[in-house]
Design a protein with these regions (language model features):
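Phosphate- and divalent-cation-binding pockets in alpha/beta enzyme and binding domains
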Residues: 41, 101-105, 167, 198
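Inter-lobe coupling linker of SF2 helicases/translocases
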Residues: 1-90, 186, 201-205
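Short, well-ordered beta-strand core segments
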Residues: 137, 155-157, 175
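Conserved helicase ATPase core of P-loop NTP-dependent helicases/translocases
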Residues: 93-95, 103-106, 110-144
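A conserved SF2-helicase RecA2
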Residues: 163-219
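A short beta-strand element within the Helicase C-terminal
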Residues: 148-161, 184-188
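Active-site-adjacent loop/helix micro-motif of nuclease/hydrolase catalytic cores
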Residues: 118, 126-128, 148, 163-170
């Protein structure tokens, strides 16, 4: 009776030999070309893009803008994301950091006529993700990387990377969890010769990428 009652609240009971049998994980690193804007800013610490002036007058602001120049200001990465989303009609989760990245990813999904769900600091709406097999779920790390069961999908694309190891590791577990019966696929969009390569290396070591590491790097 207790099990029946718990089932009504969403509990799942499994045989003992099923509990630890998680599916295989396959990781794919997609290297995208860097831009002349990134190289100029890295050298001069100053650049104007459209009407936005980026000034890296401290190590923290330089690190921030190098991250943004690797993602939201890199049209090569945008094109790579579009290609990936075009290649599947399955549910896909896209992790990102900044609001401008969200706007760019939304625009791509709209052009591809993909239904969207979002989890971020402003909104949490999983309706399309639950109901549409081809939905793209846009997840901001702080809001979506921990605690959620998103195993309706088995595919995650990393448009940009977090700095915190815990967010990175937990984000992968949103699909790789008990009850998932499909192989889990992860795609990392990494800009060549950029800060992203350093961040990815540190995250894979289960360490946070800090301002101190940035200052000690050759970037």
């Amino acid at each position: 009776r207790l099990k029946d009652k718990l089932r009504t609240h969403g509990a799942i009971f499994m045989k003992s030999d099923e509990v630890f049998q998680l599916p295989k994980q396959i990781e794919n690193i997609i290297k995208v070309d860097n831009t002349k804007e990134y190289k100029k800013f890295n050298k001069d610490r100053l650049i104007k893009i459209d009407d936005t002036e980026l000034v890296g007058d401290t190590s923290l602001t330089k690190m921030l803008y190098l991250r943004q120049l690797s993602s939201q200001y890199n049209s090569n990465k945008t094109a790579a994301l579009k290609d990936l989303l075009e290649s599947t009609n399955d549910r896909v989760i896209v992790f990102y950091n900044f609001d401008k990245e969200l706007e760019i990813i939304q625009e791509i999904c709209n052009k591809l006529e993909k239904p969207i769900s979002m989890i971020n600091g402003h909104e949490k709406n999983l309706k399309n993700f639950t109901e549409c097999n081809d939905c793209v779920l846009l997840g901001q790390y702080q809001a979506a990387a921990m605690g959620l069961n998103l195993q309706l999908s088995n595919k995650i694309i990393y448009f940009s990377l977090p700095l915190q190891s815990e967010l990175f590791m937990q984000s992968k577990k949103r699909i790789h969890r008990i009850g998932q019966d499909k192989t889990c696929f992860y795609w990392y969009l990494i800009t060549k010769n950029s800060i992203e390569e350093q961040i990815f290396k540190i995250l894979k070591q289960r360490r946070d990428y800090t301002n101190k590491l940035f200052e000690e790097s050759d970037i």
